[in-house]
C-alpha cells in the first residue's frame, strides 16, 4: 500500500503527517475488495452496458468498504483510482441499468468520507493533456476530467482543491501550449474547474511536464 503524507486540513489549517495512500488497498485487495475492476475493450463491446453496470456497482460498493477500513485504521487521505467506471467516457452514465443503485452507493461513500473527515482526491491518467495540439486529445482529456468530476459530484464532495483532481500539463512550456491549455480549461464545467490542480514537477522552468 503506497503511503504519502499531506498537510492540508479542511478548515484551512495544517495537520502534519496525515497518513494517506494511493488507489489500491493491498490488504483489502487480497480479499478481492477493490474499486479497480475493469475489462478490455473487446469485452466492453461484446458484453455491453449491462455487464459494465454490474462492474461499476461492485466497484462503488467496495469503495464504501474501503472508506470504512480507512477510518478504522486512522487513514484520513485517500486518492481514489480512476477505474470505478470502466470505459466511462464511452457512454452516458444514466444509461447504466444499475445507475440508481450506483448513484446511491456513491452518495453513501461520499457521506461516509465526509462524516469521517477524510480527504478524497483523484489523479486522472497521464494521457490527460489540455494543452495538446491534437483536438482529439483535448476532447478526450475534457471527457476524462468531467467523468472524474461527475464521480465526485455523485459522492457529494466539494468542488474545491480539497477534493482535488490532480493532473500534469504533460509538455514543456510555451505560449502556444499555455494558450491551448487555458482554452481547454475554459470548456470545463464549474465543478471540474473548482477541483482541478496542476502538479508542478519541478522541471523545464518549473512548468509541469511528463
Task: List each language-model region with its residue ranges.
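Short His-Asn-centered micro-motif
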Residues: 81, 168-170, 198-202
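Acidic/histidine-rich catalytic cores of soluble enzymes
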Residues: 175-210
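Conserved, mostly hydrophobic/aromatic
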Residues: 123
Amino acid at each position: 500500500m503506497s503511503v504519502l503524507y499531506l498537510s492540508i486540513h479542511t478548515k484551512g489549517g495544517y495537520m502534519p503527517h496525515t497518513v494517506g495512500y494511493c488507489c489500491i488497498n493491498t490488504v483489502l485487495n487480497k480479499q478481492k475488495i477493490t474499486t479497480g475492476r475493469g475489462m478490455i475493450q473487446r469485452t466492453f463491446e461484446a458484453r455491453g452496458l449491462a455487464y459494465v453496470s454490474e462492474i461499476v456497482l461492485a466497484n462503488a460498493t467496495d469503495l464504501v468498504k474501503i472508506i470504512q477500513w480507512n477510518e478504522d485504521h486512522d487513514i484520513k487521505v485517500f486518492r481514489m483510482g480512476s477505474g470505478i467506471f470502466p470505459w466511462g467516457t464511452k457512454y452516458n452514465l444514466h444509461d447504466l441499468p444499475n445507475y440508481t443503485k450506483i448513484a446511491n452507493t456513491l452518495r453513501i461513500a461520499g457521506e461516509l468520507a465526509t462524516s469521517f473527515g477524510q480527504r478524497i482526491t483523484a489523479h486522472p491518467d497521464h494521457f490527460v493533456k489540455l494543452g495538446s495540439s491534437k483536438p482529439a486529445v483535448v476532447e478526450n482529456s475534457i471527457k476524462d476530467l468531467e467523468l472524474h468530476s461527475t464521480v465526485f459530484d455523485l459522492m457529494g464532495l466539494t468542488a474545491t482543491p480539497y477534493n482535488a483532481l490532480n493532473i500534469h500539463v504533460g509538455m514543456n512550456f510555451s505560449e502556444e501550449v499555455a494558450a491551448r491549455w487555458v482554452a481547454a480549461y475554459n470548456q470545463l464545467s464549474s465543478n471540474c474547474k473548482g477541483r482541478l490542480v496542476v502538479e508542478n514537477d519541478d522541471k523545464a522552468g518549473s512548468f509541469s511536464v511528463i
